[in-house]
Amino acid sequence: MQPKVIAIAGPSGSGKSLLTRGLKAALVREAQLFERELSIAVVPEDAYYHSQAHLTLEERAVLNFDHPDALDHELLEHDLRQLKARKAVNIPIYDYASHTRDLCSEALQPADIILVEGCLLLSQARIRATLDLSVFVKADLAVCLQRRVVRDTQERGRTEESVHTQFESTVRPMYHAFLAPSITHADLVISGEEDPELAVSAAKARIMPLLIA
């Protein structure tokens, strides 16, 4: 089977990661019902933030990480095409606490399905050209902010104040400039505020025909 690349896009805190995890598990279960093996790889767009090692921590902290230029989409496109050709890649590792790339990278083997997850995927024509299916997870920005505060303070070493400041200074403006318009490129729009199982079922229903095409 030719590998399929599926994008899970949407604003930060909309539920992309939850959908990605649930979808991966659901697809594996579905394949097992038919006694098929199905390999799935997950590629996070966040891993492709440009290195900011040349800047101090204070300088990095005030950068606009929500603009497409903050990400190396050229490298992401390259890696997705390599994976589609069933070639292994080494993806960067991003450190949220230090706001830059780690010195190490992560080896990723090719798979039948590549789930690429990130906010700005559908805003980039070069990324859209690699996709077999695109999903946009939509949620109210107030909900996204609440979820982001919990996630970033508990998992990413951020303070609540810094999360609020970043949200109002860059996240919200960049959402309206880049993310909201990109929803027109989605093959499927899913609510990130409803039952996660319903979201997984809806996405799975669109993906399954690709596996027998």
What are these regions (language model features)?
Residues 12:
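The conserved Walker
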Residues 41, 50-98:
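Conserved nucleotide-sensing/catalytic segment adjacent to the nucleotide-binding pocket
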Residues 109-110, 150-153, 172-213:
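NTP-dependent small-molecule kinase module
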Residues 16:
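Conserved lysine of the Walker
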Residues 19:
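Hydrophobic positions on the alpha1 helix immediately C-terminal to the Walker A/P-loop
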Residues 31-53:
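Short beta-strand-centered segment that lines the nucleotide-binding/catalytic pocket of NTP-utilizing
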Residues 102-154:
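ATP-dependent NMP and nucleoside kinases share a basic, alpha-helical "lid"
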